[in-house]
């Protein structure tokens, strides 16, 4: 594993904040400002465990968690306050601004619209999507008119939206929309209700993208991996595939490498969310795989050869899987050694109490990453993204950001 022998990285936090960056694995409902969460809760009469930031940090959004279940506990509050169009627009706007303020030029914001929908109150798929897009676009337009872009030569800010289907939800307590789905399909098996909702999501995503020109750039499947394998959603991803909607899959976060294999072979994944278990053959549970280490090696080689990017979320993985222990044990080191296309991401800025710059700092303080490799990681964020423009525009934008990386590296004496 490529672990740094130095206790401190040569890259300062100032440099990391100034260099161009992208965050391609960023959950809206996990990335609210804590003071805004309190404001939204009061406005919408949502009960919180505390109405102070320190109180929320002590009780809900902790520095460390016992397990994935405790980590996910906070989403009941963030989703509750986001079932409001004003709050959705505010959250999206503030998320973009927070990224801009730390030098992030491109984000792909993902969330599950059906978790936030409440049709009885007029909060439909379309209104949810427009509220989020309005907030992101407002922040984009303001930044791209600023002196930072117009006079200082910084790259402009752009964004895309990734819609998440849910691997699992129950007949009550998840969202008004999901409760209504179970009522409508009361004679169906739960997994069939879940798959129906996922198909409704992808069809609506393609429709709104094509008819209303919203930058819905990708599909994701999120939620509990164990018991809800990717192959059950093959038809959903087939529809996305046939309609040029790009595809990422939460895979290998809490289940073995066979989950990653299914994401690639059953869901046509263009990118992988987390992918942590790729180099943990002990997490493989498929008894038909006799040589687990060999299986992991071959799968890793396939992913590297195909340049399928992995969205790496270090802090989140450490929090949801305490068994990792120290960051030096994280499989990011193996990803580097095996030359995988990796992208440093936050996952959830509030729940993990992190930023893109913080994630880079953690990675570079722990693993030996020379400047050329660092530039490669930055480049993957712009070359492997689901940019809402055409390929020529995407290439030009990536070129602009990487030229700016060289300028910043020169300023800090690395070139």
Per-range role (PLM):
Residues 249:
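A glycine- and charged-residue-rich anion-binding loop/surface
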Residues 2-245, 253-271, 276-415:
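Metal-cofactor-binding active-site regions of metalloenzymes
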